[in-house]
Amino acid sequence: MPKYRSATTTHGRNMAGARALWRATGVKDEDFGKPIIAVVNSFTQFVPGHVHLKDLGQLVAREIEAAGGIAKEFNTIAVDDGIAMGHGGMLYSLPSRELIADSVEYMVNAHCADAMVCISNCDKITPGMLMASMRLNIPVIFVSGGPMEAGKTKLSDQIIKLDLVDAMIQGADPKVSDEQSEQIERSACPTCGSCSGMFTANSMNCLTEALGLSQPGNGSLLATHADRKQLFISAGQRIVELTKRYYEQDDESALPRNIATKAAFENAMALDIAMGGSTNTVLHLLAAAQEGEVDFDMTDIDRMSRMVPHLCKVAPSTQKYHMEDVHRAGGVVGILGELNRAGLLHNQSKTVLGLTWEEQLAQYDIMLTDSEEVKRFYRAGPAGIRTTQAFSQDCRWDTLDDDRAQGCIRTKENAFSQDGGLAVLKGNIALDGCIVKTAGVDESILKFTGPAVVFESQEDAVEGILGGKVKAGDVVVIRYEGPKGGPGMQEMLYPTTYLKSMGLGKACALLTDGRFSGGTSGLSIGHASPEAANGGAIGLVKQGDLIAIDIPNRTISLQVSEQEMAERRAEQDALGWKPVSRQREVSFALKAYASMATSADKGAVRDKSKLEG
């Protein structure tokens, strides 16, 4: 029977000082001996996805204490990728994931907490907390802040749906008037919550559901909807149950490594491919798997990308559907239900509800259940009122979207594409692979060959695109922007956005050892591994070299002879693998990150071998 970790600080005469300090936080005599559960919040006023979380930690804490635990809340940092985008601030986004994971470990281990409820939402916060959860392997439940409502505005007598990416594209399009650009900007992000499309934040919150670490609706129920309050309440209640199951009944099935097994990671990846999620999720799943010592790597992702069809198309791949529409169609459970019927789900994997996926689908899949309560839950919809308040409205759709032939979620037979929404490409320019979000690629450019236009920073690429240096048919190459070379592996949303603004969204490709925002679409290929700073072949590309991309056959190649490649490599080895003329100030904190960063195919985690010996 495992001993409560917290007993280290609450029992024994030699812990009198620790108990005195616990008492100063409000712990009473009768509380000693109860499990201490960390409420890991991420409230900040910098981020719309987190601005409404201030009081939600205490909502969870009250439920924990009512159920027989001691709740202690702390906050992590949270970077808003959208605000950090397009300038030096983006260098800090991915490294913040490691800081979040470490800070959770520091707080939980320093105070000997027994379990956690992780209140996350946006891009690097959910992954950082997930990494910490797999590392610590104590009972945990994730509950996110929820997605933002889609924006809406009237243009040319037509109501259109909007999101953050629309504001960015219109703002850079010289053909759009100042008045229309401002109208879209003011309408794009109407409420608190994570940006309304299937961008990185919402993708990751959906994946925690598929991993079994969060409750039904976590990934899709709007931040503003009153129903979301129950997710926080039940998380507080359920974590006490999980904690007691492990520590008092020796039930190891309550631990995250026994829930998020390899089968669960494959379920999460299947979901990601089926819904055309952000390419960033590949980085984060690989990183979390390594923390949990789960044997899951790029080979598994490549294999699954060839099996799983594209069942759910959401912004930025279409403007017809946003997260509120996914929820109306049954949410994550709805997509997993279709994967299960297609034989593509490990349905004996378990979840924090204590159910197998087979059992959970029977209860929560709108295509299977007779429960009016469940159907009402999935009819929760937007109010269209600007607000920063959680649980501020109770609007519902009149009907569910259960049209699996032409609706938001499709059956395998009616899939948007039999080819999944993400793909791994390999070739001489990316020996360890690179990632493309095929859900956002127009069919006309699934095969593409063009001359390289090479840039050694995102800033130069933006200047070149807006300055007319990129023409239809070109392959834009942005290198030395990987985890080590950036450092920090910036998102390339501005270059891809400006290609669209210049009318080149379906006429060009972009290849980088950096990464992309979940808001990216188009023929945008990222995570080229090894990265240029680690001697990757993307560092050998010269202006005008032909690059051939073949998504159906999963290949990408630099059309240069092996002899020429070898000569270029010898030359680059002598010069050193670094940008020729880039001027970029890099702080000590970022240099420390770069000194241990691995390439994207390893999840851009720190190279632990550098700590050995």
Curated annotation (Swiss-Prot):
The active site is at S517 (proton acceptor). The keyword Zinc does not apply. Gene3D superfamilies: IlvD/EDD C-terminal domain-like. Its cofactor is [2Fe-2S] cluster; Mg(2+). GO terms for molecular function: 2 iron, 2 sulfur cluster binding; dihydroxy-acid dehydratase activity; magnesium ion binding. Binds 1 [2Fe-2S] cluster per subunit. This cluster acts as a Lewis acid cofactor. Mg(2+) binds at D81, D123, K124, E491. The modification N6-carboxylysine is found at K124. Keywords: 2Fe-2S, Amino-acid biosynthesis, Branched-chain amino acid biosynthesis, Iron, Iron-sulfur, Lyase, Magnesium, Metal-binding. It is an enzyme of class 4 (lyase). One of its GO terms (biological process) is isoleucine biosynthetic process. It comes from the Bacteria. It catalyses: (2R)-2,3-dihydroxy-3-methylbutanoate = 3-methyl-2-oxobutanoate + H2O; (2R,3R)-2,3-dihydroxy-3-methylpentanoate = (S)-3-methyl-2-oxopentanoate + H2O. The keyword Cell cycle does not apply. GO terms for cellular component: cytosol. [2Fe-2S] cluster binds at C122, C195. InterPro entries: Dihydro-acid_dehy_C, DihydroxyA_deHydtase, DiOHA_6PGluconate_deHydtase_CS, ILV_EDD_C, ILV_EDD_N, IlvD/EDD_N. Pathway: Amino-acid biosynthesis; L-isoleucine biosynthesis; L-isoleucine from 2-oxobutanoate: step 3/4; Amino-acid biosynthesis; L-valine biosynthesis; L-valine from pyruvate: step 3/4. Its EC number is 4.2.1.9. Functions in the biosynthesis of branched-chain amino acids. Catalyzes the dehydration of (2R,3R)-2,3-dihydroxy-3-methylpentanoate (2,3-dihydroxy-3-methylvalerate) into 2-oxo-3-methylpentanoate (2-oxo-3-methylvalerate) and of (2R)-2,3-dihydroxy-3-methylbutanoate (2,3-dihydroxyisovalerate) into 2-oxo-3-methylbutanoate (2-oxoisovalerate), the penultimate precursor to L-isoleucine and L-valine, respectively. Belongs to the IlvD/Edd family. Homodimer. This is Dihydroxy-acid dehydratase. It comes from Vibrio vulnificus (strain YJ016). The gene is ilvD.
